[in-house]
Amino acid sequence: MEALQNIGIKRRLRRFFRRDGRALIFAMDHGFEHGPTDFEPVWEHVNPRVIIRKVVRAGVDGVMMLPGMARIAGDDVKPEVGLMIKITSKTNLRPKAEQLMQSQLAFVEDAIKLGADAIAATVYWGSPQEDAMMRQFAEIVSYAHDLGFPVVQFAYPRGPYIDEKYGRKEDYRVVMYGARAAAEMGADMIKTYWTGSRETFAKVVDAAAGVPVLLSGGAKAENPLDFLKVVYEVIEAGGSGAVVGRNIFQRENPEPMIKALIRVIHRNEDPEEAAKAEGLL
């Protein structure tokens, strides 16, 4: 039975990764986690069906969204595109003291019923609520793996202890620790912060012990070339791609950025050449 479960996990992971072992995944959880103001730069993208259709047409390998958006726009994710459903989240409306906890929004079986190929959940490593999120993640992994579904951890070091000891959450030592902890808990894919250099991100990849590590895209870069350069460094460091939201949906026409990212991630193209080829420079 265990062998069959592992086959299911591997087959579903391949829905996100091309033969090169890399992936570009579009992230669409911002309306809940950050609020609809994230869509104000391009307001039509507040409609999930509008932006999902655009990114799927442009060639992303996967789409990540919360359960409610999967109900609304899941049909717009073509069968050849992987669907990742994140079942933990939080809002920015919470009191500050409670911002470092992710609550469970749905169960593994709910995501499966919505057509998920992978289940995602966040752990804020180092937060005062770390224990609760560890228990939550362990239960998700156990249940999903029993059914043959891969689990993605958004491994985000965060909290006052992290700030006090490391100075910033992107310090490679704590990002590396979070990635290793995610792998130790059974994650099949890890999304985490950029550490500032190829050399330090390579250590994060090494610490993950073979579990694919993808970049968390973060805030929109005003100069698209700057973001493409970061993604290039991630790939050169052994990273497996990127999960990108604002650097895509906060652009009036997201297609050139998506196609430039595909060039960098899947073809190892120089960022400047990729940007020029897609009219970003």
UniProtKB/Swiss-Prot annotation:
This enzyme's EC code(s)? 4.1.2.13
Per its record, the protein catalyses: beta-D-fructose 1,6-bisphosphate = D-glyceraldehyde 3-phosphate + dihydroxyacetone phosphate
* Catalytic residue list: K191
How is the enzymatic or functional activity of this protein modulated? Answer: Activated by citrate.
A molecular function GO annotation: fructose-bisphosphate aldolase activity
Name its cellular compartments: Cytoplasm
One Pfam family linked to the record? DeoC
This protein's GO CC annotations:
cytoplasm
Q: Could you tell me the keywords of this UniProt record? A: Cytoplasm, Glycolysis, Lyase, Schiff base
Tell me which Gene Ontology terms the entry assigns under biological process: glycolytic process
Q: What is its main location?
A: cytoplasm
Read off the InterPro entries from this record. Aldolase_TIM, DeoC/FbaB/LacD_aldolase, DeoC/FbaB_aldolase, FBA_class_1, FbaB-like
Q: Where does the source fall among the domains of life?
A: Archaea
Family named by the database record? Belongs to the DeoC/FbaB aldolase family.
State the oligomer form and interacting partners.
Homooctamer.
Q: This protein is called what?
A: Fructose-bisphosphate aldolase class 1
* The species this protein was found in: Pyrococcus abyssi (strain GE5 / Orsay)
